[in-house]
Amino acid sequence: MSVSIKPLEDRIVVRPLEAEQTTASGLVIPDSAQEKPQEGEVVAVGPGRFEDGNRVPVDVAVGDVVIYSKYGGTEVKTGGTEYLVLSARDVLAIVVK
């Protein structure tokens, strides 16, 4: 997937995964009651930040599925798709399948 957003420093661009539409028992959750997703696929990664004159690379790669902070990042929409630009510090974990 080609994204027209190029993150700077230790920022990453994530495409949020869809929120659950139904509960485990089959009840439909209305849009107004759904929680914001906290899981998404990394679609672009910045080069890393500088610390003491050395570039520190970002720990995630394009294609990784990550769990991120609930209130982290900035929502942007481009090409009809919504993305989230996060600092690498807002990523809590990489989902290993």
Swiss-Prot record:
Pfam families per the UniProt record, alphabetical: Cpn10 (PF00166)
Example of a GO cellular component annotation carried by this entry: cytoplasm
A single MF term (Gene Ontology): ATP binding
Biological processes per GO annotation: chaperone cofactor-dependent protein refolding
Domain of life: Bacteria
Subcellular localization(s) per the UniProt record: Cytoplasm
Cytoplasm listed as a keyword: yes
CDD domains to which the protein is assigned, alphabetical: cpn10 (cd00320)
Main location: cytoplasm
Disulfide bonds: none
Keyword field contains Lipoprotein: no
Keywords assigned by UniProt, alphabetized: Chaperone, Cytoplasm
NCBIfam families: PRK00364.1-6, PRK00364.2-2, PRK00364.2-4, PRK00364.2-5
Chain's role: Together with the chaperonin GroEL, plays an essential role in assisting protein folding. The GroEL-GroES system forms a nano-cage that allows encapsulation of the non-native substrate proteins and provides a physical environment optimized to promote and accelerate protein folding. GroES binds to the apical surface of the GroEL ring, thereby capping the opening of the GroEL channel.
Quaternary structure, from the entry: Heptamer of 7 subunits arranged in a ring. Interacts with the chaperonin GroEL.
PANTHER family linked: 10 KDA HEAT SHOCK PROTEIN (PTHR10772), CO-CHAPERONIN GROES (PTHR10772:SF58)
Family designation: Belongs to the GroES chaperonin family.
The protein's name: Co-chaperonin GroES
Organism: Arthrobacter sp. (strain FB24)
Gene that this polypeptide is encoded by: groES
